[in-house]
Amino acid sequence: MTQSNPNEQNVELNRTSLYWGLLLIFVLAVLFSNYFFN
């Protein structure tokens, strides 16, 4: 009955990967805006 632990870990992994993806998109947007404005 230890099936809840992998599920919770998968949810946390998906959440952290989602935050890293949003952070990467934000950084790329800032870099592209600086490149185009320059």
UniProtKB/Swiss-Prot annotation:
Keywords: Chloroplast, Membrane, Photosynthesis, Photosystem II, Plastid, Reaction center, Thylakoid, Transmembrane, Transmembrane helix. The keyword Transmembrane applies. It is a single-pass membrane protein. Disruption phenotype: Plants unable to grow photoautotrophically, although under low light (10 umol photons/m(2)/s) on a carbon source plants are green. Young leaves have residual PSII activity, PSII present mostly as monomers rather then dimers. Highly photosensitive. It is found in: Plastid, Chloroplast thylakoid membrane. Pfam families: PsbL (PF02419). SUPFAM superfamilies: Photosystem II reaction center protein L, PsbL. The chain crosses the membrane at residues 17-37. Its main location: plastid. One of its GO terms (cellular component) is photosystem II reaction center. One of its GO terms (biological process) is photosynthesis. It comes from the Eukaryota. Belongs to the PsbL family. PSII is composed of 1 copy each of membrane proteins PsbA, PsbB, PsbC, PsbD, PsbE, PsbF, PsbH, PsbI, PsbJ, PsbK, PsbL, PsbM, PsbT, PsbX, PsbY, PsbZ, Psb30/Ycf12, at least 3 peripheral proteins of the oxygen-evolving complex and a large number of cofactors. It forms dimeric complexes. Required for PSII activity, may be involved in dimerization as well as contributing to the unidirectionality of electron flow. May prevent reduction of PSII by back electron flow from plastoquinol, thus protecting PSII from photoinactivation. One of the components of the core complex of photosystem II (PSII). PSII is a light-driven water:plastoquinone oxidoreductase that uses light energy to abstract electrons from H(2)O, generating O(2) and a proton gradient subsequently used for ATP formation. It consists of a core antenna complex that captures photons, and an electron transfer chain that converts photonic excitation into a charge separation. This subunit is found at the monomer-monomer interface and is required for correct PSII assembly and/or dimerization. This is Photosystem II reaction center protein L. It comes from Nicotiana tabacum (Common tobacco).
